């Protein structure tokens, strides 16, 4: 269920750039959103 929700989340390039580098436990941003963005098909193609 969580995976399906993550796949439905949109991927913003600007949001990705801010969340990808600082993937630390102490980040104030939602880790779920970061993971969803990192695993988004549109973003992974460029990786």
Curated annotation (Swiss-Prot):
It comes from the Bacteria. This is Uncharacterized protein TP_0311. It comes from Treponema pallidum (strain Nichols).
